[in-house]
């Protein structure tokens, strides 16, 4: 983190790069806040550019360009308690109980389905009308499908996104809207990533896209420190 902080300060103070043209990605909000404070101390600049987690940065992308996927700028970012509230609605509507699947297991299952088994799920969320998603949910018979399609339906109905969606929706926008992709690529002159050993494939793809114009990517990682080996 110290290496990234020093590099950020050098780019701003010595090379005259505007902080708004720099992206620095950390893995936790705590690390991002610490880095902002360190950079402010080094540069004296109130503007510390984009220093954020992957998900926090994707919120910035979507707040600017969510119209490209038919979502309002005021979309909701879901935490676990929000997801559990949606699961409760689904369980009540379809007569499921915690004996069928606990909420914790259901959350894990949804994440694994989105990452591994059904990675194109976001196309359903973006392109299918709400009624069609509802129909998929109502026609589902297995607990797995009831929970998964019920959850996608609830998300779309509330204009809500979970952490997986933030990345996938951003990637979808960049794949389908060249003008938006180019705008972000040109804006981000230098990209730096901390804890690179814990990155997952969608996050890796997002970084590849973003550094595709200036091609200035700087990463810091330690393979002995990885905490997400399942990725």
Sequence positions of predicted segments:
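Short acidic/histidine-centered micro-motifs embedded in hydrophobic/aromatic stretches
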Residues: 54-57, 106-113, 169-170, 187, ...
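Conserved helicase NTPase motor core
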Residues: 1, 23-24, 31-32, 50, ...
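P-loop NTPase Walker
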Residues: 1-71, 77, 158, 182, ...
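Short alpha-helix boundary/capping elements
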Residues: 58, 114-118, 192, 211
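ATP-hydrolysis module of ASCE/P-loop NTPase motor domains
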Residues: 46-49, 67-164
């Amino acid at each position: 983190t110290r290496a990234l902080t020093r590099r950020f300060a050098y780019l701003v103070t010595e090379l005259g790069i505007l902080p708004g043209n720099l992206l620095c990605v950390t893995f936790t909000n705590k690390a991002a806040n610490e880095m902002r404070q360190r950079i402010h101390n080094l540069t004296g600049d109130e503007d510390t550019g984009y220093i954020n987690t992957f998900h926090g940065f994707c919120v910035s992308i979507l707040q600017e360009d969510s119209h490209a996927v038919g979502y309002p700028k005021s979309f909701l970012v879901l935490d676990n308690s929000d997801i559990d509230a949606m699961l409760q609605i689904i369980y009540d509507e379809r007569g499921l109980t915690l004996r069928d699947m606990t909420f914790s297991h259901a959350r894990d299952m949804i994440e694994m389905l989105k990452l591994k088994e059904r990675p194109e799920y976001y196309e359903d969320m973006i392109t299918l009308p709400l009624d069609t998603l509802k129909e998929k949910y109502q026609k589902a018979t297995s607990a797995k499908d009831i929970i998964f399609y019920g959850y996608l339906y609830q998300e779309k109905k509330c204009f809500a996104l979970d952490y997986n969606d933030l990345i996938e929706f951003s990637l979808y926008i960049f794949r389908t809207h060249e003008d938006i992709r180019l705008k972000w690529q040109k804006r981000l002159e230098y990209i730096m990533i901390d804890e690179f050993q814990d990155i997952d494939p969608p996050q890796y793809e997002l970084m590849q896209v973003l550094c595709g114009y200036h091609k200035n990517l700087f990463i810091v990682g330690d393979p002995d420190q990885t905490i997400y080996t399942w990725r």
